[in-house]
UniProtKB/Swiss-Prot annotation:
Its main location: cytoplasm. There is a cross-link at residue 103 (Glycyl lysine isopeptide (Lys-Gly) (interchain with G-Cter in SUMO2)). The gene is Rps17. SUPFAM superfamilies: Rps17e-like. GO terms for biological process: erythrocyte homeostasis; ribosomal small subunit biogenesis; rRNA processing; translation. This is Small ribosomal subunit protein eS17. Keywords: Cytoplasm, Isopeptide bond, Nucleus, Phosphoprotein, Ribonucleoprotein, Ribosomal protein, Ubl conjugation. GO terms for molecular function: structural constituent of ribosome. The modification N6-succinyllysine is found at residue 19.
């Protein structure tokens, strides 16, 4: 079992990453020097632990978003994804095939006026109510 990191190490590393993300990388030694320059860390041991956790978090950030850390670049990326508008709307197709239940739901949602809806009978799927052992 590995060592447990204290909340001091974790909080310090998160704050350092949020403020100085552009100066940090995947290399422990460069991160150690950056931590030494930007923060007053009382001991060498604590500095090394913080730099190690910063390096660990930087590797995780490259794979995807990390909980508890908000970086401007990630915020902008998330914003762009949320505001995405497709080139062609799903409703702009010539004919949209729907089953009768879906047609009723669309009518209740005031989408009954869509002219390109074509009601089709649902295809019968597998019958799951056969007794076990019957072939």
């Amino acid at each position: 079992m590995g060592r447990v990191r204290t909340k001091t190490v974790k909080k310090a590393a998160r704050v350092i990453i949020e403020k100085y993300y552009t100066r940090l990388g995947n290399d422990f030694h460069t991160n150690k020097r950056v931590c030494e320059e930007i923060a007053i860390i009382p001991s060498k041991n604590l500095r090394n632990k913080i730099a190690g956790y910063v390096t660990h978090l930087m590797k995780r950030i490259q794979r995807g978003p990390v909980r508890g850390i908000s970086i401007k670049l990630q915020e902008e990326e998330r914003e762009r994804r949320d505001n995405y508008v497709p080139e062609v709307s799903a409703l702009d197709q010539e004919i949209i095939e729907v089953d009768p239940d879906t047609k009723e739901m669309l009518k209740l949602l005031d989408f009954g006026s869509l002219s390109n809806l074509q009601v089709t009978q649902p295809t019968v799927g597998m019958n799951f109510k056969t007794p076990r052992g019957a072939v």
